[in-house]
Amino acid sequence: MPPVVIYTTAWCPYCIRAKQLLQRKGVDFQEIACDGKPELRAELARKAGSTTVPQIWIGETHVGGCDDLHALERAGKLDALLSA
């Protein structure tokens, strides 16, 4: 399974929903908390073109945010991406 990285903040309901989906699927992920860390927000802007959270990567693939992750799941494409 490729590494999964998710940038989050503690108060973000979309971050919680994205993490819950990954946890339900038994996915280990690295969570990078951006709370009060402008340098991480700047890193997000460089990597994702956005500073909104969550931002999720599966391996080298930038998935996007919570809605994007759930759309992959609904389309039946998330498992394939996780097992690549």
Curated annotation (Swiss-Prot):
The molecular function terms of the Gene Ontology recorded here are: glutathione disulfide oxidoreductase activity
Keyword presence, Transcription regulation: no
What intrachain disulfides are recorded?
A: 12-15
Give the superkingdom in one word: Bacteria
Protein's name according to its UniProt entry:
Glutaredoxin
Q: Which family does it belong to?
A: Belongs to the glutaredoxin family.
Q: Which parts form a coiled-coil structure per UniProt?
A: none
